[in-house]
């Protein structure tokens, strides 16, 4: 059984829980260690007791550097009881530093996998700060045997032209984890128009960090005078908002329903909405334009219509499949133009287009988990293995309105 040490930047992150479940379902034995940025009981994993290396906070980069340094100094004490891993996965840049220290502790033959699913704006700066961070990433990742990322645009716009990471990339999309014989295989009720007099519902679920999205959705719901309701669920990045709770509380057509378990609760929460907000203006034009968010796959898996922004990787993804809605502009008028004339027949047609897609477009099942773990196991061989990038779909655009 492959022994994996998974080093995570935030033990409370639901995505860390999902990746750990993926590795375990694939047949690996996982030791999870990392920093904690907050409490989230829903991130607990049966049978996996995480090792806490310290506490960090969103948006406090200097504090995180200090926490990483302290963790590296105490690593022998923290991991002294841990069996030597076959592979170390480092999620995000700061964990690369911890991974290198761990390799020195366990012995210099343990391969490192660098998992990077977001490109922080500081990494893209053209000044001395950006150059220093990219140099640090290049140095810390020079011995990485594999790069895992979630969007082809990250490879196209960052890892190939800017990053010094030379490891072969593996595209591992943010698909919905579905393991045979478990509750995760439930599907939301079929997408249907609301009954007369009831509102259409737009769901914005997951990492809630985009102030502009919050304002845009609030303004739109007011403009439509209750024809549309906004449902928020997940983990708000409170550092990005002046007063998230107060703002939502004062909006007549918006509500926040708290955190949820992923993937266990997805069928229920997506069954309550008609559309998925798959737009993120956080770090606009950079990371937000390149990512393929979890909610894109989650919503489509449960038959809900995704809403994307023109010119983004998400819009390209939808265009290839001729599904979804794409806004021409980031304003209320564009949103009203696309959604305002909505009819039940139009909605039914859009939902039917999604239902015709291959379920494998949205789902990562046990067979996929096992294939991933087998691929990671090849890294234990002495000779580096070439890991090809998953083939990209075509890039033709058909943007604006229903596709």
Swiss-Prot record:
A Gene Ontology biological process term: polysaccharide biosynthetic process
Keyword Lyase among record annotations: no
GO molecular function: glycosyltransferase activity
Keywords, in A-Z order: Cytoplasm, Exopolysaccharide synthesis, Glycosyltransferase, Plasmid, Transferase
Pathway(s): Glycan metabolism; exopolysaccharide biosynthesis
Main location: cytoplasm
GO CC terms, sorted: cytoplasm
Localization of this protein: Cytoplasm
Enzymatic class: transferase
Enzyme Commission number(s) from the entry: 2.-.-.-
Keyword check for Cytoplasm: yes
Function: Essential for succinoglycan (EPS I) synthesis and nodule infection. Glycosyltransferase needed for the addition of the third sugar (glucose), catalyzes the formation of a beta-1,4 linkage between the second and third sugars.
Name of the protein in its database record: Succinoglycan biosynthesis protein ExoL
Organism of derivation: Rhizobium meliloti (strain 1021)
């Amino acid at each position: 059984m492959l022994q994996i040490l998974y080093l995570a930047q935030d033990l409370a992150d639901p995505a860390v829980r999902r990746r750990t479940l993926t590795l375990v379902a694939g047949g690996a034995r996982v030791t999870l260690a990392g920093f904690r940025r907050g409490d989230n009981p829903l991130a607990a994993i049966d049978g996996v007791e995480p090792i806490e290396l310290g506490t960090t906070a969103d948006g406090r980069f200097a504090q995180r550097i200090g926490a990483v340094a302290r963790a590296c100094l105490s690593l022998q004490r923290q991991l002294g009881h841990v069996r030597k891993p076959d592979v170390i996965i480092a999620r995000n840049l700061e964990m690369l530093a911890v991974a290198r220290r761990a390799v020195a502790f366990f012995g210099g033959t343990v391969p490192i996998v660098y998992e990077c699913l977001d490109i922080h704006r500081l990494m893209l700066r053209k000044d001395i700060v950006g150059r220093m961070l990219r140099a640090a990433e290049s140095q810390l990742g020079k011995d990485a045997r594999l790069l895992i990322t979630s969007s082809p645009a990250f490879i196209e716009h960052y890892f190939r032209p800017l990053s010094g990471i030379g490891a072969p990339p593996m595209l591992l999309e943010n698909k919905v984890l579905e393991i045979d014989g478990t509750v995760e295989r439930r599907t939301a009720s079929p997408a249907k128009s609301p009954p007369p007099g009831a509102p259409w519902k737009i769901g914005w679920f997951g990492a809630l960090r985009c102030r502009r999205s919050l304002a845009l959705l609030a303004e739109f719901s007011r403009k439509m005078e209750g024809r549309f309701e906004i449902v928020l669920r997940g983990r708000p990045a409170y550092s990005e908002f002046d007063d998230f709770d107060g703002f939502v509380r004062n909006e007549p057509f918006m509500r926040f329903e708290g955190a949820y378990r992923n993937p266990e609760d997805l069928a229920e929460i997506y069954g309550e909405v008609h559309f998925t907000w798959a737009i993120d203006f956080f770090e606009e034009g950079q990371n937000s334009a390149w990512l393929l968010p979890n909610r894109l796959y989650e919503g489509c898996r449960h038959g809900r219509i995704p809403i994307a922004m023109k010119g983004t990787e998400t819009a390209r993804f939808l265009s290839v499949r001729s599904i979804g809605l794409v806004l021409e502009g980031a304003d209320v008028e564009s949103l009203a133009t696309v959604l305002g004339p909505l009819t039940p027949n139009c909605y039914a047609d859009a939902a039917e287009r999604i239902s015709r897609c291959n379920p494998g477009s949205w789902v990562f099942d046990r067979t996929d988990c096992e294939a991933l773990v087998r691929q990671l196991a090849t890294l234990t061989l002495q000779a580096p293995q070439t890991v090809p990038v998953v083939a990209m779909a075509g890039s033709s655009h058909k943007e604006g309105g229903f596709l």
